[in-house]
Amino acid sequence: ISFLLIDMATKGVSTKPITLISGKSPFCETFFDNVEVPKGNLIGELNAGWTIAKKLLQHERAFISNFGLAAGMGSKRDIVSIAKKHLGEENGKINNGFYRSEISSHKIKEHAFGLTLKRAGDEGGKASATASMFKLYGTEHNKKRHELMVAASGINGVAWDGDEFDDNDKNLTRAWLRTKGNSIEGGTSE
């Protein structure tokens, strides 16, 4: 396996968007029909492409794991606000003991994961095999976060179309469906 850079405008290169269950198309199939690539586009040595690809995957996984955490901490979709909106609140607390407990547990894990990522960065910050573990945990954490928001939203958590649902509910449904792609990108969770 060798690693080549290929200009997407090269004759014979074409793409076809892959529509996900969220309705979005962030991924594409790429087709190479009789494409010729100059030798100068070889990255590294001939037959050493897998080593380069593994390093790229480590960086991608590191990005995804941090992105999953950042999505939870700085998101417009605050899990507590959504739960209060749909379940109600009493004395400033979510008005449902089960969800209050689940969300509290989730937020504690989110905080611990954030501290772990920070510590790993402080200790060197290099992409390594640790990035695979962080990517796996970050992916599962992000999926769980969205599952909690959807569940707490009740029927509004599966909003798609219609005037009876607001745009925030519709966007939450699509974001929840989008999290399924997190377990594939950057190397599958399997």
Placement of each model-derived feature along the sequence:
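Alpha-helix initiation and N-capping motif
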Residues: 49-50, 76, 96, 117, ...
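C-terminal helix-coil-helix/basic helical segment that borders enzyme active sites and/or dimer interfaces
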Residues: 84, 88-94, 111-164
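Hydrophobic, well-ordered secondary-structure elements that form the walls
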Residues: 103, 138, 187
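Glycine-rich flavin
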Residues: 1-14, 149, 159, 177, ...
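Glycine-rich beta->alpha junctions and the first turn(s) of the following alpha-helix
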Residues: 3-114, 182
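Glycine-rich phosphate/cofactor-binding loops in nucleotide/flavin-utilizing enzymes
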Residues: 50-69, 153-190
